[in-house]
Amino acid sequence: MSQSSDPSPRLVESPLLLQSSDLFCNLDIPQLERIRHPDSLTPSPNSVPPSPMLPIPVSVPNGDWESREELRLRELEEARARAAQMEKTMRWWSDCTANWREKWSKVRAERNKAREEGAQLRSRLEILSKELGALKRERQEAATETEQLRKELERLQGKARVLVSNDHDIEEPVRDVEIEKLTKNKDSDLDNSVRLECWEIQNGGPSRSPRPRNWEDVSPSEDDTTKITALKLRLDESQKVLLKEREDKMLLNKTIEKMEAEISQWKMKCEELNKSRQEAVKQLTLLRERHQDELGRISEDLQDELGVRSSMDKKLAELRAEMEGLQAENAEEWGRRERLETEKLNLERENKKLRLQIQDLEEILTRKRRQSASALDTDLKSIQAELFEKNKELSDLRHSHSKLKKQYHERSSEFSHANRRVEQLESEVKKLRLRVEELKKELGQAEDELDEAQNQIRKLQRTLDEQTELNENLQVQLEHVQSRLRRQQNPPLFGKLRASRFSNDDAVDLGSDPDEDDLQIQVP
């Protein structure tokens, strides 16, 4: 992509940049135009306004001059209209570039927001995965503890039953039937009391029915009572751990739902970004078409201006030829022709010397141009200074020459007035040329900005594609986590404990209790 400072090749190759009127146009020095670098668009020292020409008494009919002035004025008006049109097009291009910059800034801000939110989602996913691993480990530890507690309870129940059976053997055989009934009732009451205590620990308060105190009737040993109290404490701790695990799982479910909602919102944002990208592509195509149309119009305008320029050059050449003819005709009328011719010869010699110097300078410039661009600029500045000094000397010589011809001012007043008008027109033409060159520079800058805009849109499209891929990967990871959570769902732990710990008769007694469902761990 070309830089904004480099002119386009179309502008460099235009002959308008290589043509300029200077002080040496009347002295036949065409080599001076070659001093300017073809890539530079800065005005050359040749654009210095020329010194007034030698007043020559000429008798010219007024009708021809008026018609020529009218033609020149028309051409100047046309050139001004073209310059105004080019200014309008450049303003339109500047407005378009400003609008596109605003849109690109919005798209960049949205892209940065999407990146930040994606990073936040990743960090939250990592935290949730770590929490899930910790909860799994705690769950396994709780399961092992519950298994140990269940075994301890079964062992203690066996001991209690053995003690009860020993007491019954010591009593009379007549009351065997009653004793068996009492032992069964005591065992059932003991089991019920243990279960009720577990439910009370879980619910955090007393049970609905009063707790039976049949432990005193059984009269267990002190070791058994201490073990039972220790088991109760361990059961309390396990219940608390299970409740905490349940709360953590509920929080995890809520966070997963929030993340799913956020992912759906991100999907909607991605769709909106895709729509905006499509609209931007459409607008870019329209802008390209308009740009091509404008370039075609500008090229046509440049061709028209080249034609106008060539016609003006032809007319100027004709005027110069007429002036030379008038000089030749009027030279015979004056007696001081020889003196003027000698001065002219001196001037021509000086001009020849200047031509030779210019040729030498051109050769030096070509050598230095190959070596370095910086040296070229310095040499050009020195050459421009020398040329400016030579122009000053020539203007001084012409001024002295004009002093010698004061007696011819009366007859050449009309001719000098016409010359001043021509000079004014030429200065206006130069201003218009400079304006056209500036407009060409701005046009090149607009083309470069358009290229930069296209590259930025491609980059934004790549980043949007990468962001969509990242969002899809995050969604896949979330689905994987949800599937793992579903796979890890196990049957309630306390349901297994109840089935293994109690007999079928006890299960029938406890089936109607509404507090039994609170002991089950609900895993989503």
From Swiss-Prot:
Disordered: region residues: 36-63, 201-223, 504-524
Family matches, as SUPFAM superfamilies: Myosin rod fragments (SSF90257), Tropomyosin (SSF57997)
Compositional bias of kind Acidic residues: 506-524
Coiled-coil portions: 68-167, 242-490
NAD among keywords: no
A Pfam family: Myosin_tail_1
Biased composition range(s): Pro residues: 46-55
Keywords: Coiled coil
InterPro entries linked: Myosin_tail (IPR002928)
GO cellular component: myosin complex
Top-rank taxon, per record: Eukaryota
UniProt cross-references to PANTHER family, sorted A to Z: COILED-COIL DOMAIN-CONTAINING PROTEIN 102A
Protein name per the record: Coiled-coil domain-containing protein 102A
Organism: Xenopus laevis
Source taxonomy: Eukaryota, Metazoa, Chordata, Craniata, Vertebrata
Gene: ccdc102a
